[in-house]
Each structure stands twice: as C-alpha cells, then as structure tokens.
Amino acid sequence: MIGFTLGTGVGGVIAIDGHIYQGRDGTGGEMGHQTLDPEGPTCGCGNRGCLEAYARADRIAEACGTKSVEEAIERARAGDPRARAGLERVGRYLGVGIANMITTITPQRVVLGGGVAASADLLLDTIRDEVRRHVFTTSLEGVEIVTAELGTWAGAIGAAIHGAERADAAGAAARQGRTPAVPA
C-alpha cells in the first residue's frame, strides 16, 4: 500500500505486509519530493520541481486564484473555470507522481488522505486518467486508488501508529539488552 497525505505538504508512506517501510535512515516514503520537472518551481526542501511544489495547499490555492485550498474547492464545485482548471492541473501532477510510485512498487492500493483529499471528487478522475496514461497496463491490474477512510486524520493516525511501532521495537530491543536499530 502506498499512502499520500495531501495538505500543507505532500507526505507519503509505503506499507509492506502491514508494516511501514522506513528506508535505510527512516525517511522511506518521501514521495512528495520526487522530482517531476527539474526546471519546475522551487520546493520548500530546496529542490526544483518536486511533486510537493505543485500539489501542496498554498500552491493549489495559487493555481486556482484563491486565498485557500478550501476556497479553491468551494469555487471549483460551484463551477468556477479557473478553480476547476487549477485543480485539474494539480490532479495531473498528482497522477504523474502516483504513476511513478505504482511503476516502482506495484502496490495493491494507493490511498489519498489529508485536507486536500477532501476534494477527491474533483481530483480522482484526473489522477486516474494520468495514472493510466503513464503506467504499463500489467502494473495497473488490481491497483485501487482510493481516499482514506480516516480523511484528514489519516496522516496523524499513521504517524501515531508509526511512533508506537518504533517505541515497541525500542522496548523489545532494550529488554533483550540490545541497542534498538531504529532511527531517532
């Protein structure tokens, strides 16, 4: 499973057999910082063209000509052409980022959570179209792209579970007299 948390940034998680993949140094899952365009806008991380530079909340508002992502969603639902075009553009970038991850990992499910996921009714068709455009058909078989059942709380709950797993691993290691192999 791959999860994207869409809000003030673009967070991510990779879960394999029910466990969060952490990578070598605990940073596995930084999908928001995959480069989509090396000449693109500067991201908060200093890189250029990251998915997050296109799909974080303030950039969505900017693309839609609004002060907030909530206003952008409201206007798009009311039929505002600029807001609809801005969200469609964001959906295309999200679709490309998700396609990259599907091509790399071939998960069974991609879950979209966070505040921006509240606009899923405006984004999902575009995201799915982009994914189909950029992923081999065989890699797409059986892949679901869905919104998080936990909605805007998905990222916070996932972080809490991750923290609990790390604490449990550290406690088990300490009970065995070992230093935990979990990044700080």
What are these language model-derived features?
Residues 1-5, 11-13, 42-44:
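Short glycine-aspartate micro-motif
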Residues 15, 20, 35-184:
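ATP-binding/phosphotransfer module of carbohydrate and carboxylate kinases, centering on a glycine-rich
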Residues 7-9, 116-117:
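Short glycine-rich anion-binding loops that position phosphate/pyrophosphate groups of nucleotides
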Residues 27-30:
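A short acidic/small-residue loop/turn micro-motif
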